[in-house]
Amino acid sequence: MAKLSNGYKKFLLLWVASLISTSGSGMSSFALGIFMYQKTGMGTMTGLIILAGFLPGLLLSPFAGALADRHDRRLLMMLGDGLSIIGLACILFSLQFLDSKLLIGGILLGAAISSAFSSLVEPSFRATISDLLEKDEYTKASGMVQLIPASRYLLFPVLAGLVLSIASIHSVLLLDILTILITLPITYIVRKEMQGTHKKTKENLKEDLKLGFRIIYDNKGLWLLVMLGVLVSFCLGTIQTLMIPMLLSFGGESFVGFATTISAFGMLAGGLTLSKVSIKKDFTNVLQYALLGMGIAMIAFGWWQNKILVCIFGFCLFLSLPFANTVMDYLVRITIPTIHQGKAWGLIGLISQVGYVVAYATVGGFVDFIISPFLQESGNFSQVILALIGKGEGRSAALMIIIAGIFLVIVALILPRKNEIRELEEKSEESILD
């Protein structure tokens, strides 16, 4: 077994800290999604709680990225994690003391506060990877990083469902706070052993943001990758918003948690594979096949009202995701100078994750007010669709997932015609040889 470098050991410590923290937030997100849907009976509200926990952090990510290039990145990670407890405390206060008229607003406010502080973590963590590792370690580390979002959907939704069945949502939120308190000393250990890599600059924050945007936009290959990120995030946001309404229609809360966990094991399998086997060539082909696999799996996931098939295709969907993310992450990382990666990752996070915002804000309402009334009509077209995908509650959400999957397949088939990504691939191969 090859000996791990000192930088990779530090990366693993930060990775463990991030994994623990993300697992706790995954429990809270799952529990709050169930709580909001059961409270209101609307997919729109499920999307709204996800949006509240996502949008503030997204909007602040460019500023957080610029800060990551100016200040101690590990300190910013500690501040982001630690201060996010304020938002969780706000949610706990709302659940305990607010009446039904104010409860939803209090929960949304708490989710937004937690999201705002958490925005400090992501760009600092991504930029720290480049501080710690050599270029030939990037894809292996990227495979490990893919496991972090997977942890949100592995055993922890099942655990959250179990806690909800024997206790209350308060217990889930307290467990989330506990995971944050565990991660802080781990990050501090790494910070203590590292010298700050930030450099003082005379440029102001506005100039930093402009420079970050120019770095991304002027390179057409990078810009195309960011646009692909928008598409992928929209499809994932669609799944996250509509999975609960769709699965609750033919399974209970326990099945929703079980199916979510099985699906996320696909991401775990993909991430573990990439952590062992580095991608060194054929990046465009890997990206195309990954997007194609995701699209086909999304279509099949929404098509069937069969618990076994839903779990199988959910697994396949998330199995493909780490390969797409790793290719995009690596090509971006190898192209942008390390000194500018904080601001660049902050802006890339803002732009590429616009797809999540669009999905969280629109797909629930689109299903509730457009697709559902359409399927309830007696027209020939709606009846044909129902004959294909089945009838019953939750099929409107399933149809929206199928539509998103079809769009992803079309994009994957068009991708090989884009030479800009192949140019990034050629540069990355030259870098590895060097």
Protein language model features and the residues they cover:
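Juxtamembrane intracellular "pre-TM" segments in multi-pass secondary transporters
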Residues: 1-11, 192-227
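Substrate-agnostic recognition of the 12-TM MFS/MFS-like secondary transporter fold
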Residues: 12-29, 50-68, 72-85, 106-165, ...
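C-terminal transmembrane bundle of multi-pass solute transporters/carriers
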Residues: 59, 63, 76, 90, ...
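MFS-fold secondary transporters
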Residues: 37, 90-98, 114, 186-187, ...
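Primarily residues marking transmembrane-helix entry/exit sites
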Residues: 7-15, 43, 100, 104-108, ...
